[in-house]
Amino acid sequence: MKKKEPKISVIMPVYNAEKTIERAILSVINQTYNNIELILINDGSTDGTENIMKSYLEKGSKIDIKYYFQKNSGPSIAKNLGINMAKGEYILFVDSDDTISENYIESLVINQKEGTIIGASYKIIRDTEKNDNGIIITNKIYDIRNEILNDLVIGNLNGFIWLYLFNKEKMKNIYFEKDIRYMEDTLFLIKYIINNNINNIIYLKDIYYNYYQTDGSITNNTNKIIKNILSFTNSIRKIENIIPKEEKELKEICKKSRANRISKLIENNVSKIKERKILKEYQKSEEIKQIIKELIEDCNIKSGYKLYLKFTMNSPYILFLSYVKIREILKKMK
């Protein structure tokens, strides 16, 4: 007797995606695997997204399509609603900008093993005139839990939630945090691994996920720059807090990673400051001052970078611009 195919719930949070939602939906409908429910969560879209999604409800499909509307609350709340509504044995997340290969779900199910997370490699497709698309392949097989957590914490392992198939039964009491703007996927994945004592991640060899990136405009707004830094800092600290206390070595790695990753984010955001007013507001921010103070006192930060942090917080506008420009030139020369 043929074994019954497990139902897969595909959760797709959607916000103002009228240009991309159809291709995303079709890539799920056209899967070689049939026992699928597609859960569309409309996060308060204000463009034509709703009409496109509802048209697929009216057309009918070989897969079960469900539609839910919520007042705009962000992707984390939308994903949590999808988790609660899901009826499948397994859950897969797909972003409304992206597409999946037609045999993606079938390959995930075939390779699924108890106590193991199955992951995928992906292709980056950038919405630019430059031919700078990329393929991210992960060949490593993980069989030690702390090695998985270590690589997630320091950023060597992709925490993108759409790369993995999750067991619904094992997701009890694991949700996305609504106040997290950065690394919410990584935080969710770490919780799932710790709660279920996962020791193995196996990656499929072929490319199954198409990750579409659009060019972001230059951030030249103080509130946004400060918010980026504060949100990222908050995310890193939350990850550090969920690592079990007895994992002292991993805790220390997390602390070191926090300092290095926050420093890089600060540099990326500060380098985008192009106006005198923006720099002054950044330098006056008490929250930023506190973060900089902690980084300067951190023994994991190199002395040269500490000087950079001090300089950007205290230098006049012209000196600041010159310093940032010289630093960018030196980086390109390396």
What residue spans do the PLM features occupy?
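N-proximal low-complexity "stem/linker" segments adjacent to membrane-targeting elements
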Residues: M1-S27
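Short, acidic, metal-binding catalytic loop of nucleotide-sugar glycosyltransferases
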Residues: L26-N35
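A conserved acidic beta->alpha catalytic loop
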Residues: S27, N42-N51, S73, D95
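Glycine-rich, basic loop-to-helix element that forms the pyrophosphate-binding segment
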Residues: Q70-A86
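Short aromatic/hydrophobic "clamp" motif used to bind/position activated sugar donors
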Residues: I91
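Flexible acidic/His/Gly-enriched loops in nucleotide-sugar-dependent glycosyltransferase catalytic domains
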Residues: S101-I180
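Conserved nucleotide-sugar donor-binding catalytic segment
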Residues: R145-I225
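Membrane-interface aromatic/basic loop that binds lipid-linked glycans or pyrophosphate carriers
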Residues: S271-K334
